Regions:
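Bilobed periplasmic-binding protein-like "clamshell/Venus-flytrap" ligand-binding domains
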Residues: 6-9, 52-86
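Pocket-flanking alpha-helical
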Residues: 1-26, 48, 66-67
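Extracellular/periplasmic bilobal clamshell ligand-binding domains
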Residues: 48-49, 54, 60, 65-68, ...
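Solvent-exposed, acidic/flexible segments
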Residues: 14, 33-41, 52-59
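Short, solvent-exposed loop/beta-turn-alpha elements that line the ligand-binding surface or hinge
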Residues: 1, 19-46, 77-108
Length: 108
């Protein structure tokens, strides 16, 4: 559509900044804002190496480009809060933010 600004969200699938940053590559199917910058794409491509130091350096460069272009404005990060009795056992929380109680039990 024809718009100046929109809101979008993403829950990280895995624990790496590339999970968020790759959303803004030109050909990413989830690049809803249609952001395109060859310099950004090149930094993301250069981050796909085994050397973690180079990986994070290139991702930081990509992030700097994204912020300089104001292609995204991070405004919030999801948090979960949970109060649980120490006697409740067997529950777990997924990286997607879901709480699983089906294996829960009370330990007396």
């Amino acid at each position: 559509g024809d718009y100046d600004v929109s809101r979008n969200g993403w829950v990280m699938d895995y624990n790496d900044p590339s999970n968020m940053l790759e959303l803004f590559t030109t050909n990413n199917g989830n690049n809803d804002g249609k952001y395109a910058n060859p310099e950004f794409d090149a930094a993301i491509d250069a981050s796909k190496v085994a050397d973690k130091s180079v990986h994070f350096q290139k991702l930081h460069e990509a992030e700097d480009i994204l912020m300089k272009d104001a292609a995204a404005i991070p405004v919030a990060y999801y948090n979960d809060f949970w109060l649980q009795s120490p006697t409740l056992k067997g529950t777990w929380h997924s990286p997607y933010g879901y709480w699983y109680l089906q294996y829960g039990y009370i330990e007396e």
